[in-house]
Amino acid sequence: MLYEKFEYNINNLIGNFGLSKISIAVSGGSDSVALLYLANIWAEKNNIELFVISVDHNLREQSKQETHYIQNISNSLNRKHYSLSFYHQNNFSNLQERAREGRYDLMTNLCLELDILVLLTAHHEDDYVENFCLRLERNSGIFGLSSSNINWYNNIQIIRPLYNIPKSKLVEYLVRHNIKWFEDESNSSDKYRRNVIRQKLAKGADYIRHFSKPVYREEFKGDTERSTAAYTLVREDASTGTASKLSLEAKCGKMSKAAIISQQLKTNKLIENEFKPELISAIAEAVKIFEYGFAFLDLVKFDKFSNEVKVQIINFLLIIISGQSRVARFYSVEPILKLITQDVNFKNTLHGCIIKRIQNELLIYREFGKKLPESKILLDKSVIWDNRFCITKNQETPNCFVTHLSLKDYKIIKKQLDLEPLKNLSCKNHNAVLLTLPIIKILEKVIAIPHISYYDNDMWNFEVSFSPNFVSRFTHFC
């Protein structure tokens, strides 16, 4: 039965956390409505408080009805419901991605306020299949093709207990129990490639890949044991132990839903057993991240790891140092990897960072000047600035705000600054790093630069920590 499978999944995913409360994302579609009823049964059995969260993206007239419907269901189940709104501000550029990020920002921030550690979402088996196909068409590597049933966002654990349950079973459950749900009209539009894939697979047809990009990444030819995920999986299945470029295209060009699920499981197994442990080892061995918001990569140690892991390490550092949430595309990272192999010093910019080779190390620090971080007023006790630093005031300091150091301000206070520790740690790149650090000002006057212990008055006391909101499916550090 459906509930028994759900119960087995969620108990395995959550483990022995001893949770007293949990949250669930519900939109009004069949997937999330079914999840709500299943989770409600499980929560009652385990004496767990269930909080229901809906997000209105203000894009469809029907969304208001959906939110109201979920509120009514929540009330009937005696569960607390929270309705949140995402405002696109009439900016429709890359809207789907921005809406997704906005939705998760809203939901996880609410979880933090409510002291909830886990958020359930209704990603089911068909979603995983569609994602695999879309990533295959983007020529993703093995990390990109893999999937996970547990993710992290804003230090909230995102759990997907429907991962091995097809949508048809969820719909059957709702019909059997006479439960209403809403259909999003955009899901039937051929405008989105995901919908085309979904409709074909729903009819039992094979998935036929669109070859809009090269199938085989040439730079991985030398990695004889492991290369891109598709290539690796073909090698595993081939009786001869080898696979030509032609056979790769044939294998990935046409696949049934069952074959896609099989490939997905093999990919996940390879990630979990080999690549993920290697990535964690690589970060531990080759990476040093400093409280000043810059990092060094040991290129001698870096060289021993596989190409796919190297890409992940560079992206890991770019996200951490830039404060951005999106990873850089492979075609952007590739030139950096090629430069590293040439064994010459260089200086490049990428993803809001400066990447500078200094002999056998790679220094990565925040690019300054292209897009300056916004100033933040210190109204509360603490504030996050530049998506990277948490600044806390330990006394009442009226009218102060956090910003960056301008060249004008630097010239005024230059002689009062002790930059020797920063100079030594950054291999004499202290001036560039200094301009990326948070400073506290009152009106036009710099009153504190906590990183270098500069205060214009002994009464000031601020704490600062490097706390980037890092999001990854493969590593998580609170």
UniProtKB/Swiss-Prot annotation:
Query: Which subcellular locations apply to this protein?
Result: Cytoplasm
Q: Fetch the CDD domains from UniProt.
A: TilS_N
Q: Name one Pfam family in it.
A: ATP_bind_3
Per the UniProt entry, the Enzyme Commission number(s) are: 6.3.4.19
Domain notes, please? The N-terminal region contains the highly conserved SGGXDS motif, predicted to be a P-loop motif involved in ATP binding.
Family classification: Belongs to the tRNA(Ile)-lysidine synthase family.
Name under which the protein is recorded = tRNA(Ile)-lysidine synthase
The gene behind this protein is tilS
